[in-house]
């Protein structure tokens, strides 16, 4: 159901993204970050599908419930309908649809879809992490087993001769730059990749990057889906100020 929701939201986003007449109807949220009609439409698409399940939905573009209200939810969906709105507005294709199922504070299912690249990352606590390329819709007879069979297991065994750091294209903070400088002192050959949205976490889970440092403020919907994928690929997300 999460994959179906992500793909349908991606289709909705692309219909706006590829429309040459679209000005994206950009608004500003309370924190001054951009919001477009695509964010709103993707949210409605996902919420309509996920609301058919027994679990509540926490979405970046939905009604923001106080933490005291939702902290006792044992199982819930955490959604970012359009992660990387700045990248969407720039039309560089580096935006994603993020959906996670979280149980007792632990992300156990994660789905991240890249509409422009038609790439789907998905993971489950019991099945591992996978990447499927060239997908836009689910077949009528689609099953999880068929999805897994058509996908590549993560991480891939990629041979690299350098330490790869992937960092934010839109939020490269002084703290991140200092971290990268420290990595360069530790490793002889360091390559820096810049990317937008949750693609960065996917690149680490995939084995194309070694680390993604982030020192900018983040919310649950920024990391939940990527965290599930990283965990299922045998990796982890840590707080920067803790060992």
List each model region and its residues.
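Residue-level signal for inorganic ion chemistry
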Residues: 13, 39, 50, 85, ...
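Glycine-rich active-site/cofactor-binding loop and its immediate structural neighborhood
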Residues: 73-112
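N-terminal subdomain of lithium-sensitive/metallo-dependent phosphomonoesterases centered on the IMPase/IPPase/PAP
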Residues: 1-82, 158, 178-181, 185, ...
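Oxyanion/phosphate-interacting regions
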Residues: 1-6, 10-11, 147, 177-186, ...
């Amino acid at each position: 159901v999460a994959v179906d929701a992500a793909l349908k939201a991606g289709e909705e986003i692309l219909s706006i993204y590829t429309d040459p007449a679209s000005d994206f109807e950009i608004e500003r949220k309370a924190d001054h970050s951009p919001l477009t009609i695509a964010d709103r439409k993707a949210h409605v698409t996902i919420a309509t599908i996920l609301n058919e399940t027994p679990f509540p939905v926490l979405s970046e573009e939905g009604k923001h419930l106080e933490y005291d209200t939702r902290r006792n939810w044992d199982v819930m969906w955490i959604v970012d309908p359009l992660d990387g709105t700045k990248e969407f507005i720039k039309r560089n294709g580096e935006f994603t649809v993020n959906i996670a199922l979280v149980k007792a504070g632990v992300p156990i299912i994660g789905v991240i879809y890249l509409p422009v690249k038609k790439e789907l990352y998905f993971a489950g606590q019991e099945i591992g992490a996978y990447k499927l390329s060239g997908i836009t819709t689910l077949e009528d007879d689609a099953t999880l087993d068929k999805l897994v069979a058509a996908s590549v297991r993560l991480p891939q065994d990629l041979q690299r001769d350098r330490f790869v750091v992937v960092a934010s294209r839109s939020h490269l903070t002084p703290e991140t730059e200092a971290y990268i400088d420290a990595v360069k002192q530790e490793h002889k050959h360091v390559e820096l990749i810049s990317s937008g949205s949750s693609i960065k976490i996917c690149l680490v889970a995939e084995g194309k990057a070694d680390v993604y440092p982030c020192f900018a403020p983040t919310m649950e919907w920024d990391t939940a889906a990527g965290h599930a994928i990283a965990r299922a690929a045998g990796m982890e997300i840590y707080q920067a100020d803790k060992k």
